[in-house]
Amino acid sequence: MPSDREGLWMLAAFALMTLFLLDNVGVTQAKSFDDVRCKCICPPYRNISGHIYNRNFTQKDCNCLHVVDPMPVPGNDVEAYCLLCECKYEERSTNTIRVTIIIFLSVVGALLLYMLFLLLVDPLIRKPDPLAQTLHNEEDSEDIQPQMSGDPARGNTVLERVEGAQQRWKKQVQEQRKTVFDRHKML
């Protein structure tokens, strides 16, 4: 029986393989109008307003004579009009854009789920902190030692190590407060 981690890896591998197969199927249709185009931007010319023309042409045919149809100027002004037009060949992969967006949204969604999980589990894991209660009651911390559950050398789990680090940090902060406020000394 596979563990949860192995199951997640298998699911991720299956999802990547599915995306790869869908991408390969889409390659046959990839050269659509949205992926490959010739874009000509023509400024205003005499009494004709400016216009942007988008057509599906090859890179070698990407010029004003092929893309601008119907030609808005009479035959003798075509060359002058086309010299003003700026034509660019543009190519992009919508499948790559889609896959990138899907991966980005998946990562953001996983992080949000993890955050919600931590928000729900955190109150269940936290124990009342006797050190924090002493700070609120303004009692002297030298008389009260923080209670450690179990053997101090046992801190094997991440949670126990984090709680130990928090206890040490809180003790340091309390000592600093005592030094500054009671003894009026700066560090």
UniProtKB/Swiss-Prot annotation:
Q: Does the keyword Isomerase apply?
A: no
Q: Which GO cellular component terms, listed alphabetically, does the Swiss-Prot or TrEMBL entry include?
A: late endosome; lysosomal membrane; lysosome
Domain of life of the organism encoding this protein: Eukaryota
Tell me what topology the record assigns in the membrane.
Answer: Multi-pass membrane protein
Compartments where located? Membrane
Could you list this entry's UniProt keywords, alphabetically sorted.
Membrane, Transmembrane, Transmembrane helix
Protein's recorded name: Putative protein 2
Q: Which organism is it from?
A: Takifugu rubripes
